[in-house]
């Protein structure tokens, strides 16, 4: 049985110039870093190394491009190296101690807020942007940058279902994010990024600001999502990375309340049944319910008490 692969930063954090990926000038050094032979590298450069399928578990179906085992190992290795490079404070995704909730909390307050995301972010980050990152930002030789960009992309773009997707999408688009950050900071506007979700809050967040953000994004060959871009007025509630943000605190979304209480009612109806099948089903519902309640407990402490009572429940 294969051991599960995971990103390992070894608790390291350093500048881009101190990365093991910096200034790789020969194929031999690249092969050594990735622990690959010439033949293995050659076999991994085709798009046939991905399992491609449709994920229908969400409201909107998503095309998933997941690397097969050998390529997944290489992606995990490169992702581990990329995740050791320090990222700006405005990034809240893929960083220990940060989350969608720290991203949302940053914007608590009455100020006008702009929420948006980049349409089809991974698919719209093309191989030439990945090549530019390895060649210009990491100062690799052109042939090494070409190999790395081919290893890290599927059908000419960043894959949608790899461990490398999130960190590489940031670095390949760092110029765009940094330009947006500079533009915001000059106007005393707070900006945060969670993968492809970008949020701005401040007194100078206006329609003109929104239009200029749109221009910057388009300048870097991306599209501001037309239906997911909202300009929130002063003192209004806004949904930021899954949490409702008010003037003084985070709140739980109504749909999350409804989902929790629907499953809680279902669990309470069947929790005392004794058949084997019902016990398995009850445990599944209980675990799913606890997962949802624990998640919302990060926003509202009252849910932590509810989770404890469910976890400690014993049949009469």
Cite the ranges covered by each PLM segment:
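Right-hand nucleic-acid polymerase module
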Residues: 1-56, 61-162, 171-178, 182, ...
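Catalytic palm active-site di-aspartate
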Residues: 115-119, 161, 165, 186-202
């Amino acid at each position: 049985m294969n051991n599960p692969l995971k990103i390992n930063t070894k608790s390291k954090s350093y500048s881009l110039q101190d990365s093991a990926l910096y200034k790789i000038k020969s194929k031999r050094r690249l092969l050594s870093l990735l622990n690959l032979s010439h033949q293995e590298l050659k076999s991994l450069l085709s798009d046939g190394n991905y399992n491609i399928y449709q994920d229908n578990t969400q409201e909107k179906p998503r095309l998933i491009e997941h690397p097969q085992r050998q390529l997944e190992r290489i992606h995990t290795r490169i992702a581990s190296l990329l995740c050791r490079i320090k990222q700006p404070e405005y990034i809240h995704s893929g960083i220990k101690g940060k989350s969608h909730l720290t991203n949302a909390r940053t914007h608590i307050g009455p100020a006008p807020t702009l929420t948006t995301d980049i349409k089809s972010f991974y698919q719209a980050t093309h191989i030439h942007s990945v090549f530019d990152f390895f060649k210009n930002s990491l100062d690799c030789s052109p042939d090494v940058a070409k190999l790395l960009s081919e290893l890290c992309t599927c059908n000419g773009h960043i894959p949608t279902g790899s461990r490398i997707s999130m960190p590489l999408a940031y670095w390949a688009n760092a110029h765009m994010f940094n330009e947006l950050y500079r533009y915001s900071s000059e106007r005393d506007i707070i900006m945060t990024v969670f993968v492809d979700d970008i949020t701005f809050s401040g007194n100078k967040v206006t329609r003109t600001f929104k239009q200029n953000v749109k221009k910057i994004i388009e300048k870097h060959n991306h599209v501001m999502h037309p239906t997911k871009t909202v300009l929130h007025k002063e003192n209004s509630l806004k949904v930021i990375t899954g949490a409702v943000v008010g003037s003084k605190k985070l709140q739980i979304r109504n749909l999350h309340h409804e989902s929790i209480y629907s499953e809680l009612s279902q669990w309470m109806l069947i929790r005392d049944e004794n058949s084997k099948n019902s016990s398995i089903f009850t445990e599944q519902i209980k675990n799913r319910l606890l997962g949802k309640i624990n998640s919302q407990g990060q926003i509202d402490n009252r849910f932590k008490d509810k989770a404890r009572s469910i976890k400690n429940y014993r049949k009469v």
